[in-house]
From Swiss-Prot:
Binding of Mg(2+), residues: 7, 55
Cofactor(s) listed: Mg(2+)
Chief localization: cytoplasm
Keyword Magnesium attributed: yes
Organism lineage: Bacteria, Bacillati, Bacillota, Clostridia, Moorellales
This protein's UniProt keywords: Cytoplasm, Fatty acid biosynthesis, Fatty acid metabolism, Lipid biosynthesis, Lipid metabolism, Magnesium, Metal-binding, Transferase
MF terms (GO), sorted A to Z: holo-[acyl-carrier-protein] synthase activity; magnesium ion binding
Keyword Lipid biosynthesis: yes
Identification of the protein by name: Holo-[acyl-carrier-protein] synthase
Role noted for this protein: Transfers the 4'-phosphopantetheine moiety from coenzyme A to a Ser of acyl-carrier-protein.
The gene coding this protein: acpS
Amino acid sequence: MLEAGIDIIEISRLERSIKRHPRLLARVFTPAEVAYCLARHRPGASLAARFAAKEAVMKALGIGLGRCSWQDIEITREQGGRPRVILHNRARQLARELGVGEITVSLSHCHAYAAAVALVESSFSEEG
């Protein structure tokens, strides 16, 4: 079975939130995600794309907010630049329980918005 999740976020909204609540970076993103994004030309856009990806993964898994930590879903990059999802702790456990085989994600951003789509392939179906 294939499940999809999508999310879009206004980049400036996330930037304002981080400015008001600096601890948000450490609460939502892994140290590796923060380091990567802060080294980019537009750190806010990179952070927002990863935020959207985490939300899209949660939606595709059907777990919603609060079932795992934001940091349990990490967005990295393969050598060729393709984004990759790594699940940790509770998110990994939930994915196993759901029979998740593979998660793919696509990120995009423009001047004002960042968006992500996640596809989750699982071996379980509601039909049995």
